[in-house]
Design a protein with these regions (language model features):
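N-terminal secretory signal peptides
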Residues: 1-15
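Histidine-rich, glycine-flanked metal-binding segment
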Residues: 23, 48-62, 68-113
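Metal-coordinating catalytic core of metallo-dependent amide/deamination hydrolases
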Residues: 52, 182-294
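Active-site gating loops and adjacent loop-to-helix segments of metal-dependent hydrolytic enzymes
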Residues: 126-157, 267-280, 300-303, 351-375
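Alpha-helical scaffold segments that flank or form the walls of functional sites
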Residues: 128-201, 220-232, 467-469
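His/Asp/Glu-enriched, well-ordered alpha-helical/loop segment
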Residues: 321-416, 432
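C-terminal cap of metal-dependent C-N hydrolases
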Residues: 406-463
Length: 491
């Protein structure tokens, strides 16, 4: 979504500091007491025994005999091969790796890196599908960016982040960028970080603005966040500044060593920032850029994050897939908002694949000369994995099954009714599969989903918490209560 201007915010008043009396430590303590966290699942003994113990120092797991897609051009792909996970890392990839580790039968599976989402406002998790017919302006800005955002307490941020992060894991997304423009107060920011941490997903926390008011300390509170929660470079959570076009904000990001993630759906807005643009910036949407701006992004080494379903549905403009390809700008996929679209990456891959090909076919029918090549299914799966890791500044750590990288791995069921018999691995992923095919998910070597079930969260408890939070926000926003015609008038 586009950043919200001051005129699009409404003051929220005093922050609710009681929830986080001592920042993230308060949330963690509450979670331990069962007040904020969702209790781990206690599976039956047989199921528990079947879940591999992995991700810890010295723990090894061998994924045996799968179709292995590495996203690493030096390694290539394998019709049948093994992946060895040791601790949090990928130790080896190849056919017939020696035994010596607990073995998981990956036959009938596609083994690949997890998907990487480069822009999602996950604080809105409990508001899924609430604005299905909405435009960006005025609907989203008014109903979500103002009414809902003003109503959120820190605990609502926590629940939204936790729910959306687990939803991402369930869909095979092992890394996401949380574009968190809900920093109404430092407590809200700490709640977002804690929700990400408690989910166990790999994430870039994009510290963004929030509802205007005396407790909003954006962007300066990023210094405290850096010290308190992001002092280590090798943790699951890393820090970015989610911002707009104020050069002073960019300076603060560079001061604390945080990359920049930026909504840009205007025309000409980047020109005053030309000298500040660099490879540490990822630009979102970009449906209306000038030719000069495209050149600036390309020359400065920036990346793109496209949310094509949202851009088409909500009125941002035509997703600039071909402009990115023409300018050789690395691009990636993002879900943006679950208020309108599903949280999976199969939807994202299909939408972008179909849209680019439709546009190229139209140019061919118009007898245009020198028509660009069509995207392939392999292209779009690469964009959804290593392309996302690059746009999230994490491609040295994740996004491919390169030995030495973090073991962010998914196993996709290739013998399921919707894709059997398997004839084309990339085609099955991009065109045939959905979340039901995500059989297992590893994040930093730890099992987060196993045999189709999430591991480490009580889904029923999480649902109850999400419903209570949703009901509170709806009551505060004074929306009608109905699931038939929508909570919001006209939706």
């Amino acid at each position: 979504m586009s950043e919200l201007d001051e005129s699009e915010r409404r003051p929220r008043g005093a922050s609710r500091r009681a929830f986080l009396a001592s920042g993230a430590a308060g949330l963690a303590a509450s979670a331990a007491a069962g007040l904020t966290g969702c209790a781990p699942v206690a599976p039956a003994a047989a199921a528990r025994a079947a879940i591999p113990t992995s991700g810890g120092p010295g723990q090894r797991v061998l994924l045996k005999g799968g179709v292995v897609l590495t996203m690493d051009p030096r390694l290539g792909d394998f019709e049948k091969a093994d992946v060895l996970i040791e601790g949090s890392k990928i130790a080896a990839v190849g056919p017939n790796l020696p035994a010596g580790a607990p073995t998981i039968d990956a036959s009938n599976m596609i083994v690949m890196p997890g998907f990487v989402d480069t822009h999602r406002h996950i604080w809105q998790g409990q508001l899924r599908n609430i604005l299905p017919n909405g435009r960006l302006d005025p609907d989203y800005f008014r109903d979500i960016g103002a009414s809902a955002r003003n109503a959120y307490r820190p605990e609502d941020v926590y629940v939204g982040d936790l729910l959306s992060a687990w939803g991402a894991i369930n869909a095979g997304i092992t890394t996401l960028l949380d574009w968190s423009h809900i920093s109404n107060s430092p407590e809200h920011s700490d709640a977002a970080v804690q929700g990400l941490r408690d989910s166990g997903i790999r994430a870039v926390y994009g510290y963004g603005t929030g509802a205007a008011g005396p407790s909003n300390q954006y962007p300066n509170d990023i210094r405290r966040l850096r010290r308190q929660s992001f002092s280590s470079a090798d943790q699951l959570l890393t820090l970015a500044l989610a911002t707009a076009f104020d050069p002073k904000h960019w300076e603060v990001a560079r001061e604390v060593g945080a990359p920049i993630t930026l909504h840009d759906n205007g025309s000409g807005l980047l020109l005053p920032l030309a000298r500040m643009m660099g490879p540490d910036v990822t630009y979102i949407h970009c449906c209306n850029l000038t030719a000069e701006e495209w050149k600036l992004i390309a020359d400065s080494g920036g990346s793109l994050s496209l949310a094509s379903p949202i851009e088409m549905e909500m009125g941002h403009g035509i997703p600039p897939i071909q402009q990115a390809l023409d300018h050789k700008i690395p691009w990636s996929l993002s879900n943006d908002v679950e208020t309108e679209i599903p949280s999976d990456f199969f939807t994202q891959m299909r939408t972008n694949f179909f849209l680019q090909r439709m546009q190229i076919f139209a140019r061919e029918r118009a007898k245009e000369a020198n028509v660009p090549p069509l995207l392939t299914v392999k292209d779009i799966v690469h964009v959804a994995t290593i392309g996302g890791a690059r746009a999230n500044w994490l491609d040295k750590r994740t996004g491919s099954l390169t030995p030495g990288k973090e073991a962010d791995v998914v196993l996709l069921a290739a013998n399921a009714i919707n894709v059997m018999p398997l004839n084309h691995a990339y085609g099955a992923i991009a065109l045939g599969m959905d979340t039901s095919n995500v059989d297992a998910v590893f994040v930093a070597g730890r099992v987060k989903k196993w045999k189709g079930d999430l591991v480490g969260v009580d889904v029923d408890q999480l649902r109850a918490r999400a419903e209570r939070s949703r009901d509170y926000v709806i009551a505060q926003a004074k929306w009608p209560r109905t699931v038939l015609g929508g909570y919001l008038p006209g939706h």
